[in-house]
Amino acid sequence: MANATTYRTCPRSGLQFEDQAEKLMKANAFVAVVWLLIGGLLAIGVVLTRWPALRWLEADTFYMVLTAHGINMLIFWIIFFEVAVLYFASSTLLRCRLATPRLAWLAFALMVIGSVVNNIAVFRGSS
């Protein structure tokens, strides 16, 4: 039983995007930007606390926010965006289909669940 693979040709670049890979690229890039936004908002808390005239957060809250900021900006944003780029490079530039799209979606779901659980642990103070 052969699976029919559908491709979309970009009108600007002429690149061919495989359907499942394109959806995974968009999903990973979107979640990456969400983590970047959350990390940027946490950076405001870090900066306002480091400003000597303001001292916005208490010490324990400051380090919790600093930890969440670092994890979101240095790990989650980079990893999700890197996966989006890898799907682009492996499927679009090499013109290949995804071998196991269901497994790829499972991996994406596990990445999202893991990153959310990690943030919950940090904000509960139990990390």
Regions found by a protein language model. Name each.
Residues 13-27:
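N-terminal juxtamembrane segment and adjoining first transmembrane helix
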Residues 2-11, 26-53, 60-96, 101-127:
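Hydrophobic cores of alpha-helical transmembrane segments in multi-pass integral membrane proteins
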